[in-house]
């Protein structure tokens, strides 16, 4: 059933895959708003900042949900990796990135090692994809690793235009094992825990 309050799309995925960039670009193309949930909640009483990890943690889930729902309007594009916070969108797109490439990107950004490891493991283990599927069933999955941003944008446009959503098959655990990255990230994780 159609709900007039539904946002147009949710662009989700592990931090560092390009959600915010694509949300803003898609919103500009559609002449609507990109609601970046992280930016919306930063500095509110619903989250607390953890300086050593350079991240926010949700401390009031109900309050955060109400805040997000109070801002989202029909047609908006939402960007977040915390799928529990958003109203049901018309379409859900999970952006994916190879864990070794994601590791390099987050390191380039100067993120703390623990935060990098948490996010790389989340990508290897499909955490955001699984949460999205648990909530909405089948969702589109786009591997951005070897795609130019313009190619990803074209796939997103087709998906939100009501056309058939492109969906890649991703197996980052197998990929990481075959490439040797899994051994590297396990070793790094063990050394970080001491």
Swiss-Prot record:
From which domain of life does this come? Archaea
Listed under GO biological process in this entry are: ribosomal small subunit biogenesis; rRNA processing
UniProt keywords (A-Z) are: ATP-binding, Kinase, Nucleotide-binding, Ribosome biogenesis, rRNA processing, Transferase
- Asked if the Swiss-Prot or TrEMBL record annotates the protein with the keyword Nucleotide-binding, the reply is yes
Region span, LID = 108-118
- The protein's Enzyme Commission number: 2.7.4.3
Where does the chain bind ATP? 16, 18-21, 109
Q: Which reaction does it catalyse?
A: AMP + ATP = 2 ADP; ATP + H2O = ADP + phosphate + H(+)
Q: Does the keyword Iron apply?
A: no
A Gene Ontology molecular function term for this protein is:
ATP hydrolysis activity
**Region: NMP, residue numbers:** 36-59
Which top EC class is given?
A: transferase
Q: What does this protein do?
A: Broad-specificity nucleoside monophosphate (NMP) kinase that catalyzes the reversible transfer of the terminal phosphate group between nucleoside triphosphates and monophosphates. Also has ATPase activity. Involved in the late maturation steps of the 30S ribosomal particles, specifically 16S rRNA maturation. While NMP activity is not required for ribosome maturation, ATPase activity is. Associates transiently with small ribosomal subunit protein uS11. ATP hydrolysis breaks the interaction with uS11.
What binding partners and quaternary form does the record give? Interacts with uS11. Not a structural component of 40S pre-ribosomes, but transiently interacts with them by binding to uS11.
PANTHER family reported in the protein's UniProt record: ADENYLATE KINASE ISOENZYME 6 (PTHR12595:SF0), POS9-ACTIVATING FACTOR FAP7-RELATED (PTHR12595)
Q: Which family does it belong to?
A: Belongs to the adenylate kinase family. AK6 subfamily.
Which named protein is this?
Putative adenylate kinase
Originating organism: Pyrobaculum aerophilum (strain ATCC 51768 / DSM 7523 / JCM 9630 / CIP 104966 / NBRC 100827 / IM2)
């Amino acid at each position: 059933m159609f709900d007039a309050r539904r946002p147009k799309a949710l662009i989700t995925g592990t931090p560092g895959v390009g959600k915010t960039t694509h949300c803003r670009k898609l919103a500009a193309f559609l002449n609507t708003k990109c609601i970046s949930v992280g930016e919306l909640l930063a500095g509110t009483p619903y989250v607390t900042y953890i300086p050593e990890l350079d991240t926010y943690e949700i401390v009031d889930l109900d309050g955060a949900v109400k805040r997000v729902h109070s801002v989202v309007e029909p047609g908006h594009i939402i960007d977040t990796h915390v799928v529990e916070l958003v109203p049901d969108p018309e379409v859900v797109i999970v952006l994916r990135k190879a864990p070794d490439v994601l590791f390099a990107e987050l390191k380039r950004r100067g993120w703390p090692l623990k935060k990098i490891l948490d996010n790389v493991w989340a990508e290897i283990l499909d955490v955001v994809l699984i949460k999205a599927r648990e909530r909405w069933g089948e969702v589109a999955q786009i591997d951005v690793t070897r795609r130019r941003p313009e190619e990803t944008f074209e796939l997103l446009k087709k998906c939100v235009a009501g056309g058939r959503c492109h969906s890649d098959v991703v197996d980052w655990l197998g990929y990481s094992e075959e490439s040797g990255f899994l051994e590297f990230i396990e070793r790094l994780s063990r050394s970080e825990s001491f």
